[in-house]
Swiss-Prot record:
A cellular-component GO term for this protein: nucleus
Pfam families in alphabetical order: Linker_histone
Main function: Histones H1 are necessary for the condensation of nucleosome chains into higher-order structures.
Protein name: Histone H1.2, embryonic
Source organism superkingdom: Eukaryota
Keywords assigned: Chromosome, DNA-binding, Nucleus
Organism of provenance: Parechinus angulosus (Angulate sea urchin)
Gene3D superfamilies: Winged helix-like DNA-binding domain superfamily/Winged helix DNA-binding domain
Location of the protein in the cell: Nucleus; Chromosome
Keyword presence, Cell membrane: no
GO biological process, one term: nucleosome assembly
Length: 62
């Protein structure tokens, strides 16, 4: 997703990692909180991440 977002910017001079790192860290943090990403190793944005399990589709107890 991050690569697609940076590619979509189509900046001729490239993108600044310093400026984009804030948004990347925020996206990783929210992904871990929602469960779409799982942090496998490390702390913060320097760790390793993988995709989380998809939640069960619309199951309710009645």
């Amino acid at each position: 997703h991050v690569v697609a977002a940076i590619t979509a910017l189509k900046e001729r001079g490239g993108s600044s990692m310093k400026k984009q790192s804030v948004f990347i860290k925020k996206a990783l943090k929210s992904g871990v909180e929602k469960g779409t990403l799982v942090q496998v190793k490390g702390k913060g944005a320097s760790g390793s991440f993988k995709l989380g399990k998809k939640p069960a589709a619309g199951r309710t107890d009645a």
